[in-house]
């Protein structure tokens, strides 16, 4: 079986070449060809000796996930569905803005965490993505988006906020992050790469030590009672532990704040009292808030907060001195908005079946 070199960061690729009797510097050459030139076969790598190209063709491969579908929203948002085998597909979304181009990348086929307001969570869970399947999303998007008139890459920022919980696929995500940051890969700065987590505290500590990129935390509640209901992981790592982990992370973080993501659910977490509880909760954590109007999906059981409730909630936080943004809903006409990514998941958890039974019971 051939070795897919897309699974290696520079350290791994260097080790691979050394193990196969080749000069270690070849790793940098091959990495640049794969990630900066978008090469898909070794014959394109003209600065490698023919004998090495032949050897690589015999022993190795560059396997990119295949494109299943591409869509473009009326607002310029683009979504790609990529085939990761055995009937599974993951979604990657590009969001254009005036000062940046952000790519939202998936880390798992489905998600095991069962956050109740998230479409991905309803799809169940199949498996972790490999490092090649994670970085392959950036490879595809770079190929599709090209460069600006100034010969700069259109994709300037990456957020690990697609399908799945990145911290639950720690090793493969870290390898992909290493490729993103490497000057022989995509050359992104740590400040422009963000990992989002629902609050896996031990993995937050590990990421701080090995790959401290910008951090976003899917908070979504101001107290344990509400968060236990909508983010079940909170029962394992309650808010007090999560806030302490955020403080520890900031010691090595490239930014001096944590971004707290907060989906606005009508009547659940969007009242003035919740905003005041939030202020008390995060008082020792330098942070900013990203309020996310809930993006409906069929049979979710939730409603989007009213614009008035979102405004009042935002104003309370701002008056307390916090930086607060209300996320614009982008790509909702192609189901590319936050919380809508579902891909194609061959569920191994029977979660889809469970939700169908619940819905049938409600209808009965």
Curated annotation (Swiss-Prot):
SUPFAM superfamilies: Radical SAM enzymes
Binding site for S-adenosyl-L-methionine: 164-165, 196, 218-220, 295
GO terms, biological process: rRNA base methylation; tRNA methylation
UniProt keyword terms in alphabetical order: 4Fe-4S, Cytoplasm, Disulfide bond, Iron, Iron-sulfur, Metal-binding, Methyltransferase, rRNA processing, S-adenosyl-L-methionine, Transferase, tRNA processing
InterPro entries: Aldolase_TIM (IPR013785), Methyltransferase_A (IPR040072), RlmN_N (IPR048641), RNA_MTrfase_RlmN (IPR027492), rRNA_lsu_MTrfase_RlmN/Cfr (IPR004383), rSAM (IPR007197)
GO terms assigned for molecular function: 4 iron, 4 sulfur cluster binding; metal ion binding; rRNA (adenine(2503)-C2-)-methyltransferase activity; rRNA binding; tRNA (adenine(37)-C2)-methyltransferase activity; tRNA binding
Annotated CDD domains: Radical_SAM
UniProt superkingdom: Bacteria
Described function: Specifically methylates position 2 of adenine 2503 in 23S rRNA and position 2 of adenine 37 in tRNAs. m2A2503 modification seems to play a crucial role in the proofreading step occurring at the peptidyl transferase center and thus would serve to optimize ribosomal fidelity.
Family to which this protein belongs: Belongs to the radical SAM superfamily. RlmN family.
Protein name as it appears in the record: Dual-specificity RNA methyltransferase RlmN
Natural source organism: Neisseria meningitidis serogroup C (strain 053442)
Gene, per the UniProt record: rlmN
């Amino acid at each position: 079986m051939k070795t897919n070199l897309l699974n290696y960061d520079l350290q791994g690729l260097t080790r691979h070449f050394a193990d196969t009797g080749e000069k270690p510097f070849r790793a940098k050459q091959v990495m640049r060809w794969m990630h900066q030139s978008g090469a898909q076969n070794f014959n394109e790598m003209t600065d490698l000796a023919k004998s090495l190209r032949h050897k690589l063709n015999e022993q190795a491969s560059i396997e990119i996930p295949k494109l299943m579908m591409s869509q473009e929203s009326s607002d310029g948002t683009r979504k790609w569905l990529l085939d990761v085998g055995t009937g599974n597909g993951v979604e990657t979304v590009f969001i254009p803005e005036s000062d940046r181009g952000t790519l939202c990348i998936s880390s798992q086929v489905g998600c095991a965490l069962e956050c109740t307001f998230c479409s991905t969570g309803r799809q169940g869970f199949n498996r972790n993505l490999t490092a090649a399947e994670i970085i392959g999303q950036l490879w595809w998007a770079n190929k599709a988006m090209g460069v600006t008139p100034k010969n700069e890459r259109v994709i300037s920022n990456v957020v690990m906020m697609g399908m799945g919980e990145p911290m639950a696929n720690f090793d493969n995500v870290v390898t992909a992050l290493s490729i993103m940051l490497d000057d022989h890969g995509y050359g992104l700065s740590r400040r422009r790469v963000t990992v989002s987590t629902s609050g896996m505290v031990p993995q937050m500590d590990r990421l701080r030590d090995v790959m401290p990129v910008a951090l976003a935390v899917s908070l979504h509640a101001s107290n344990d009672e509400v968060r236990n209901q909508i983010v079940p992981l909170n029962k394992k790592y309650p808010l007090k532990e999560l806030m302490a982990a955020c403080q520890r992370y900031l010691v090595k973080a490239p930014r001096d704040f944590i971004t707290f993501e907060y989906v606005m659910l009508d009547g659940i977490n969007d009242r003035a009292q919740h905003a005041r509880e939030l202020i008390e909760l995060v008082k020792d954590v330098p942070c900013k808030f990203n309020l996310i109007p809930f993006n409906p999906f069929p049979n979710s059981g939730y409603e989007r907060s009213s614009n008035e409730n979102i405004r009042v909630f935002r104003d309370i936080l701002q008056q307390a001195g916090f930086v607060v943004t209300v996320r614009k809903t982008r790509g909702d006409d192609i189901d590319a908005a936050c919380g809508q990514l579902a891909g194609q998941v061959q569920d191994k958890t029977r979660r889809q079946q469970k939700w169908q039974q619940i819905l049938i019971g409600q209808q009965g």
